[in-house]
Each structure stands twice: as C-alpha cells, then as structure tokens.
Regions:
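Conserved SAM/SAH cofactor-binding pocket of Class I
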Residues: 14-86, 91-94, 99-106
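S-adenosyl-L-methionine
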Residues: 1-18
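Alpha-helix N-cap/helix-start capping motif
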Residues: 9, 31, 53, 149-150
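Conserved Class I SAM-dependent methyltransferase catalytic core
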Residues: 4, 122-172
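Mobile active-site "lid"/loop adjacent to the S-adenosyl-L-methionine
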Residues: 97-128
Length: 172
C-alpha cells in the first residue's frame, strides 16, 4: 500500500497559519501533509488538490475516517487548470514532484503509473508548478515548498519575480 515519507510531515511542520486561515495543499497525493497540518492546527481550513483520481479518493476517504472531513476537503483536479477552489488562499503548501522530466535528464520514472505521476514532473515543470501555486495565493500570503537542495536555484528563479520575503530553511 501507499506509505507517506517524511517530506509531507516536514512540509506541514513548516506552515504557519492563524485562526481561520485557508490552506491549500497543492498536489496533495493521499493527503499526508494536509492531515499532519490538520492535526497540528485544528483551526486551519484545508483544501487538498490532487490530479490523480485514485489518490484524491483515498485522501477524501482518509479525511472522513479520521474525523477531519469537515476541515480537510479534497478536490480532484489539475494544478495547471484547477477547478474552482474558492481561492485565494492564505497559505499554499506543496511538495512538487522531485524528479525532473525524463527528457530533461530526470532519470527513469517508477514503473507504477501513479507513482510516476507523483514523483516525476509531467506537463507542469517546477517553474510552472510554482507559478500555478502563486496564482492561488492571497496578496501577502505564504507559499511553503519542500524540495531537493539541488533545485533551489530553480525554485528561487520561479518565486523571485513575484515574492518579496523569501526564507530558505535547510532540512538536514
């Protein structure tokens, strides 16, 4: 079955949200980061957006089974052209696919299609992913991203034109 890694736990731990803030988990997968955040910040209202129907269904079922169905809403959709999510959000958190597309030297994707989609960039490269997240964010909102250190320059290039206050928190 699906197992969550440490990345979504660290992502959720880095989010600061005040009472009533709305948080989007962009590319939520099975909801691990959203559930960690909901457990830590019971006042937050969280929406998870996931392109893969099976993962979105599993995340929605998990929210209900864990008593979080009223605070964690899962929506199936594409970040590149999202459905109406009620944006803008106070916080957008995201754990984008870590693997660059194969044609960009990203290596061989996992053989299972769901994992390949979750782990490898597809129609949205990293810069497009970040720009899509920024479009869903309120003015002066927070974007929280977890990614590999070797992609830091790409991340900074994607946020620099529109973000003012940038903090990089190394995770060792």
């Amino acid at each position: 079955g699906f197992r969550a890694a440490i990345d979504p736990v660290l992502l959720a731990a880095a989010v600061r949200a005040a009472y009533g803030h709305r948080v989007l988990d962009a590319g939520c997968g099975t909801g691990a980061a959203a559930f960690c955040l909901a457990a830590r910040l019971p006042h937050a209202v969280i929406t998870g957006l996931e392109i893969q129907g099976a993962y979105a269904a599993l995340a929605g079922e998990s929210a209900d089974l864990n008593g979080m169905g009223t605070r964690v809403r899962i929506v199936e959709g594409d970040l590149g052209g999202p459905p109406d999510l009620g944006a803008p959000f106070d916080v957008v958190m995201t754990n984008p696919p870590f693997g660059a597309a194969q044609e960009k030297g990203g290596g061989t994707p996992p053989p299972e299609a769901g994992l390949a989609t979750a782990h490898m960039e597809s129609h949205l490269g990293l810069a497009a992913w970040i720009k899509a997240c920024l479009k869903l964010l309120k003015h002066n909102g927070r974007l929280v991203v977890i990614h590999r250190a070797d992609r830091l320059s790409d991340l900074l290039a994607a946020v620099a034109p529109t973000c003012g206050d940038i903090h990089v928190l190394p995770v060792w």
